[in-house]
Amino acid sequence: MKGKSDVMRTLAFAGGDKYVGEWSDGKENGHGTYAFVGGDKYVGDWRDSKRNGRGTQTYSDGGSYVGEWRDDKKHGRGTQTYSDGSSYAGEFRNDKRNGQGTLRWANGDKYVGEWRDNKENGQGTYVFADGDKYVGEVSDRKRNGRGTETYSDGREYVGEWTDGKRNGQGTLSRPNGQNYVGEFKDDLQSGQGTITWPNGQKYVGEFEDDKPNGQGTYSFPGGAKYVGEVKDGFYDGQGIYTSTEGWTQSGLWNRGKFVKADSSPGGNAHQ
């Protein structure tokens, strides 16, 4: 049943806005076009003088929204394009990106996943223009929680993230067969960890700034071993090297070279 005075109306408002469309019960009801004085424009469904249903809004900055509305807010499914060239397709709630959706940036990056209050939050996938890809937990537009990133150079990281960086426990695999398992800090190998090489060599110990630093143990396929202090990956400081033949060098090392034997008897048993 039609409402009272269900007619087409053209209304010009004191502030400069203009409405052309269906009118009933003294309100915008039905289908109509509303031109805002600032340059925005809405074409679509109305109920009780508010945008309700499906409609298209174009903005003065060149952006647009096509989709569902409730009480003058984007609510439901829709597609929004922005003046910077990016676009979002998915769910909205109370005028914000909420739920499942896909955002494509002008530079070619893409995010597919969960949203909360206009931010990437929950489970999602980032696909970057440079070929990198992240799948995992996201909060406040950053990789946070557990996730897997595959890099364009063939590396893969599986583990914990904080504020978009590798932080916590994780595994970094390289295409040459080298693998690191252990702690990370601000994208770098830092803390306790283990590196294995494809030739069977292994290092277990402390890391800092992406390199073995501190106390650690190198072991080699033939049975040789170094136990002691390391710096930037080199034997450096006090340490004991045991060869495959069984002889040892115990003492001070510098940049991988043995420089001084222990003063105690038997400190250097190299024969």
Task: Name the predicted role of every residue range.
Residues 257-271:
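Terminal, low-structured helical/coil segments at or just beyond the last alpha-helical repeat
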Residues 1-4, 14, 264-265:
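N-terminal leader/linker segments that initiate helical-solenoid repeat arrays
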Residues 1-5, 18-29, 41-52, 65-75, ...:
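Conserved anchor residues at repeat-unit boundaries in beta-strand-based tandem repeats, strongest
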Residues 6-7, 106, 127, 156:
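Acidic, Ala/Val/Gly-enriched low-complexity intrinsically disordered segments
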Residues 5-6, 270:
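Acidic, proline/serine/threonine- and glycine-rich low-complexity intrinsically disordered segments
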Residues 10, 24-29, 33, 50, ...:
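Threonine-centered tandem repeat motifs in low-complexity domains
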Residues 13, 34-36, 59, 82, ...:
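Aromatic (phenylalanine/tyrosine) cluster motif
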